[in-house]
């Protein structure tokens, strides 16, 4: 469903985009993420809070690939950089460490970066922080067993937006040592690709401080299709607007979008859980983008 021709009411935008209000069990889900993430950090080999910049928010957590994973002995591991959600104003990298264990076990180096939060900074500032984070990962991945030529970015919700933005980055303009294809692929889960509607959602707009111009400038759907590949997934039980957002990026970027699927039986929050569930379609897409799907087949619809 697309929005009516006349701009809907503020209440309509809040209903479509305020996912915590739409999901009564959101507190239990957030607690599950926190508990599972604490367990992951306790069990995995890790290097935590590594600076990628000078600001205190510019830190990342690194989880090296398991030696028994799907990478040949002595070979460098593909790198998965995962960006947390929270509408650019909430949550922390530590809330989503739980996605790391199955990818580490499969042979990937997993990196979770932090960034500053709105309203202290704007979304454009956050995008540039993540650009610096990815540049750091490219330059230092080998120190942790990672292959800098095989970087994939995943993200949930606002993190899905940031993952798509990183695909569009002109890396050679950032620094001469960075390759044009620094990010080879991205997996966006419940991403936001058109930011204009967020300007009209009272629960969110004051923190984001978007203008019509900045919303368009920061909307992946209105940027040229990148060289890298995108998989865009959304929960089938999400709001009509999130389903529209997912269809929009597929239409805008065309063949660069490998899939723009709705995951059955999942809403905006529990759709992320699938990333950490081996055998799920979402996890299989992650493996395939990393080159770790040994079956080398498109994930099934189930």
Ranges and model annotations:
Residues 80-82, 110, 230:
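Hydrophobic beta-strand anchors of alpha/beta hydrolase catalytic cores
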């Amino acid at each position: 469903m697309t929005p009516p021709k006349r701009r809907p009411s503020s209440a309509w935008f809040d209903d479509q985009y305020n996912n915590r209000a739409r999901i009564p069990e959101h507190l239990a889900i957030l607690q599950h993420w926190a508990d599972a993430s604490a367990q992951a950090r306790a069990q995995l080999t890790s290097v935590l809070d590594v600076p990628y910049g000078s600001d205190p928010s510019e830190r990342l957590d690194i989880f090296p690939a398991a030696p028994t994973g799907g990478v040949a002995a002595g070979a460098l591991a593909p790198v998965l950089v995962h960006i947390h959600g929270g509408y650019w104003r909430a949550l922390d990298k530590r809330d989503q460490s739980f996605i790391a264990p199955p990818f580490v076990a499969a042979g990937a180096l997993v990196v979770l970066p932090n960034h500053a939060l709105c309203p202290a900074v704007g979304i454009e500032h956050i995008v540039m922080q993540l650009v610096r984070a990815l540049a750091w990962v490219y330059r230092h991945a080998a120190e942790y067993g990672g292959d800098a030529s095989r970087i994939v970015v995943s993200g949930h919700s606002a993190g899905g937006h940031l993952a798509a933005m990183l695909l569009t980055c002109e890396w050679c303009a950032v620094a001469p040592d960075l390759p044009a294809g620094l990010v080879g692929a991205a997996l966006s889960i419940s991403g936001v690709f058109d930011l204009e509607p967020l300007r009209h959602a009272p629960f969110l707009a004051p923190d984001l401080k978007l203008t019509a111009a900045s919303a368009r400038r920061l909307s992946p759907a209105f940027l040229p299709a990148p060289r890298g590949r995108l998989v865009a997934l959304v929960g089938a039980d999400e709001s009509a607007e999130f389903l529209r957002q997912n269809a929009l990026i597929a239409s805008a970027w065309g063949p660069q979008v490998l899939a723009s699927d709705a995951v059955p039986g999942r809403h905006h929050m529990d759709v992320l859980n699938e990333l950490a569930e081996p055998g799920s379609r979402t996890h299989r897409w992650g493996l395939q983008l990393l080159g770790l799907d040994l079956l080398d087949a498109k994930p099934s619809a189930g």
